[in-house]
């Protein structure tokens, strides 16, 4: 994955609120000699219930917390409410992200570039129906959201109440890569962000409101997640055609290796893989995201030419 050095980045929708212990984070750099770069955000999380009403988080963080850490979901729904953007004290983490060249050199700036690409892709795809995600917010430790107070244990997630994607970029080194054996590579984080943006698209289209069953191999929760995987595949196919605000291409290269990394990341967070690794057996009745094979397959449906109708997992007889 490489970005067009001439592309201009828009940082207005990407914010960092720093560490819960205080202080911002430095601008991380990609390893030298790696055009595809390094990133450690391999887990696509899920959707958090908004407004303090829904007490269940439909996220892979649910499995991570309950099965790896022995706790709850990591989301305190009691403090839900609308997002007060003024409460964020932004660090300057993304201030130096100005061009595609910066994105080729910095994990942080690559994150901005991917957000810009998702914004452009879904704007073109949805047309007048499009409403952009309010923000991509990175944090460390804990953060207040429109869906409640969330800890790093939740993993990346989308909050419909404030139209915002949240992620702790350090969480995935520890959990997915080290504990679940997930892949490491530049396009892994891009896949994660695309999957979370897919949840925003579902919110825009009203699909999130169709979720009635929370667990099970054919549950609405699984269908929601697989559809977001399919949307991520759609974006990946069209990413090299996305542009900055002046019409300059954002990406200069997206390779087969990048797609392989996305598929590997999708498989590593399949419910069956997580359950087998964390509890030694598979329980389909408790699935919320789908199997490794399903996650890969639905990503491919989107990537191999699928459109919104092809990604309608709620209409699929077989997942």
Residue ranges and their predicted role:
Residues 173-191, 216-222:
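Short pre-active-site segment immediately N-terminal to the catalytic Zn-binding motif
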Residues 1-95:
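Long amphipathic alpha-helical segments used for membrane anchoring, targeting, substrate engagement
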Residues 109-115, 119, 125-127, 227-272:
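Short helix/loop segments within enzyme catalytic domains
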Residues 142-168:
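Catalytic zinc-binding patch centered on the HExxH motif and its immediate surroundings
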Residues 122, 167, 191-204, 225-229, ...:
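Active-site recognition of the HExxH zinc-binding catalytic motif
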Residues 272-319:
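Pan-zinc metallopeptidase signature
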Residues 97-120, 127-149, 249-255:
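Acidic helix-start/capping segments at beta-turn-to-alpha-helix junctions
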Residues 203-226:
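Post-HEXXH active-site segment of zinc metalloproteases
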């Amino acid at each position: 994955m490489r970005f067009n050095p001439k592309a201009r980045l828009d940082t207005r929708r990407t914010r960092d609120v720093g560490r819960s212990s205080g202080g911002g984070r430095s601008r991380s750099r990609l390893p030298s000699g790696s055009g595809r770069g390094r990133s450690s955000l391999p887990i696509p999380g899920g959707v958090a219930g908004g407004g303090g009403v829904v007490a269940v988080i439909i996220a892979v963080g649910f499995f991570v917390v309950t099965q790896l850490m022995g706790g709850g979901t990591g989301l305190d729904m009691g403090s839900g409410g609308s997002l007060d953007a003024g409460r964020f004290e932004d660090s300057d983490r993304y201030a130096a992200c100005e061009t595609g060249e910066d994105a080729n050199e910095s994990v942080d700036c690559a994150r901005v570039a991917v957000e810009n690409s998702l914004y452009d892709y879904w704007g073109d795809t949805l047309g007048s129906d499009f409403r952009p995600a309010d923000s991509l917010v990175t944090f460390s430790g804990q953060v207040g959201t429109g869906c409640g107070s969330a800890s790093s244990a939740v993993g990346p997630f989308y909050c419909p109440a404030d139209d915002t994607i949240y992620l702790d970029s350090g969480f995935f080194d520890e959990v997915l890569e080290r504990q679940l054996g997930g892949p490491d590579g530049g396009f892994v984080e891009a896949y994660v962000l695309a999957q979370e943006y897919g949840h925003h698209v579902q919110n825009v289209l009203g699909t999130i409101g169709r979720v009635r069953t929370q667990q099970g191999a054919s549950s609405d929760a699984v269908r929601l997640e697989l559809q977001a995987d399919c949307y991520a595949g759609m974006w990946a196919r069209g990413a090299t055609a996305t542009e900055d605000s002046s019409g300059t291409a954002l990406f200069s290269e997206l390779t087969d290796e990048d797609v392989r990394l996305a598929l590997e990341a999708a498989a590593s967070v399949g419910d069956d893989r997580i359950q087998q690794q964390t509890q030694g057996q598979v329980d389909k009745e408790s699935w919320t995201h789908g199997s490794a094979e399903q996650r890969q397959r639905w990503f491919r449906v989107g990537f191999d030419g699928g459109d919104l109708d092809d990604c309608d997992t709620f209409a699929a007889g077989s997942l």
